[in-house]
């Protein structure tokens, strides 16, 4: 798998993108650790905080097509640099917010838009445009693993900071770490080499978007990714609450999130390898089907520390490993010239699901006292996602660019 990255500069580009994603995704995927401290500090309630987090899920996805389009048109450097600055600003502002609207601004808008601008659509799009075809699948897996490794590092780190110094200091530390990642942007800001003369003529961004929106395979891919966003956002936001309902210490939640991240490092690398060998739609089918089975296992198992850790490892293996095969299908259908934009649109579908997963989780807890109905919805959506991927066509359209 890694042999394809031995070409000059391939590892530098790949690791720079992975490093940026480690910070932006590590920050986003660990926000659930702040729900209880925010509730205790502000008295706003879980529903209000869940709403701010849900707005953040949607904003993170909504910025993806726009950030991808700007990066495709003008280059990724300014987009990534601005995103990191905005993420740092949102994190630094949050301790000063004591209202629902304030949290929506800091966490739901600034932090979410900033991390979204420094996330998959821009990073995978920029790296794919700068790497040869043979290296793209492996690079996608490594970049995705960087995001998962961020969750593995950030979850226990932020939990320790919360316990030792309080949640406000943890937020300010997050802002400082984000700023420290800005030098990596320079690697991806370098201009693209001119395309070879025999390359397919560029049909333009708008024409590519129109073709994607009307393509049945692209529509089915987005439906599956909606389900992915639903349960990832639900777990990221409400896993600490589920752990508390089971009478277990908060450290179980932070370590479960860390295990999810660590397992997905291996899952992402394996997904990148599978994309290079098998049809991506079958990779996605088995990933989504396994999630439904893992949730059934969790519901039937006794609620102990070990159960949460096994559940986290099993679910974590496919957590964000859906990104390489999903991005690969978009690239196969439409080429890589506007991959940042078109994959960004797919990520928007993911985060619309994320909005419902984060918000409905808080609503279910308030209304029913537990997350039972959310788990059942999660099983149904994961099974549906597995099935809708099977009819997808993995063949380039005639006008695919790049």
Identify the residue ranges that each predicted region occupies.
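C-terminal ends and interior cores of transmembrane alpha-helices
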Residues: 85-98, 290-303
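Cytoplasmic helix-loop-helix junction between adjacent transmembrane helices
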Residues: 107-145, 335
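Residue-level signature of mid-helix packing/kink "hotspots" within the transmembrane helices
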Residues: 29, 57-65, 152, 261-269, ...
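Helix-to-loop junctions at the C-terminal end of transmembrane segments
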Residues: 63-75, 268-279, 365-366
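Helix-loop-helix hairpin linking two adjacent transmembrane segments in secondary transporters
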Residues: 143-190
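Extracytoplasmic gate region of multi-pass secondary transporters
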Residues: 31-35, 216-268
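Flexible cytoplasmic inter-helical loops of multi-pass small-molecule transporters
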Residues: 187-207, 398-402
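Hydrophobic core of transmembrane alpha-helices in multi-pass small-molecule transporters
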Residues: 90, 102-118, 226, 307-321
């Amino acid at each position: 798998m890694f042999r394809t990255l031995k070409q000059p500069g391939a590892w530098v580009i790949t690791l720079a993108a992975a490093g940026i994603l480690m910070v932006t995704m590590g920050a986003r995927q660990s926000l659930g650790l702040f729900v209880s401290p925010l509730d205790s500090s502000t008295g706003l309630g879980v529903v209000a905080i869940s709403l701010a987090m849900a707005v953040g899920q949607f904003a993170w996805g909504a910025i993806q097509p726009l950030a991808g389009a700007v990066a495709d048109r003008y280059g990724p450097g300014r987009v990534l640099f601005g995103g990191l600055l905005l993420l740092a600003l949102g994190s630094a502002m949050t301790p000063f917010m004591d209202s629902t609207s304030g949290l929506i601004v800091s966490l739901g808008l600034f932090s979410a838009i900033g991390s979204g601008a420094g996330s998959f659509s821009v990073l995978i799009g920029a790296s794919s445009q700068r790497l040869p075809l043979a290296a793209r699948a492996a690079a996608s897996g490594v970049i995705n693993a960087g995001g998962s490794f961020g969750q593995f590092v950030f979850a226990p780190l932020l939990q320790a900071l919360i316990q030792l110094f309080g949640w406000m200091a943890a937020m300010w530390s997050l802002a400082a770490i984000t700023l420290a990642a800005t030098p990596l942007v320079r690697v991806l800001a370098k201009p693209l080499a001119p395309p070879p003369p025999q390359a397919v003529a560029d049909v333009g961004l708008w024409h590519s978007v129109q073709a994607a929106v009307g393509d049945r395979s692209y529509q089915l891919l987005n439906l599956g990714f909606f389900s992915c966003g639903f349960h990832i956002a639900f777990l990221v936001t409400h896993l600490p609450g589920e752990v508390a309902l089971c009478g277990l210490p908060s450290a179980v939640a932070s370590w479960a999130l860390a295990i999810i991240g660590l397992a997905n490092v291996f899952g992402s690398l394996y997904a990148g390898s599978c994309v290079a060998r098998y049809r991506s739609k079958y990779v996605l089918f088995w990933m989504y089907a396994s999630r439904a089975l893992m949730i059934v296992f969790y519901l039937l198992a006794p609620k102990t520390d070990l159960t949460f850790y096994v559940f986290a490892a099993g679910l974590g293996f496919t957590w964000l490993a859906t990104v390489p095969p999903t991005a690969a299908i978009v690239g196969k259908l439409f080429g890589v010239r506007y991959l940042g934009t078109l994959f960004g649109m797919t990520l928007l579908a993911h985060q619309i699901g994320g909005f419902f997963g984060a918000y409905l989780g808080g609503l279910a807890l308030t209304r029913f006292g537990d997350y039972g109905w959310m788990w059942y919805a999660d099983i149904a959506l994961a099974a549906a996602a597995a099935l809708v991927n099977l009819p997808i066509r993995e063949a380039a359209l005639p006008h695919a660019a790049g």
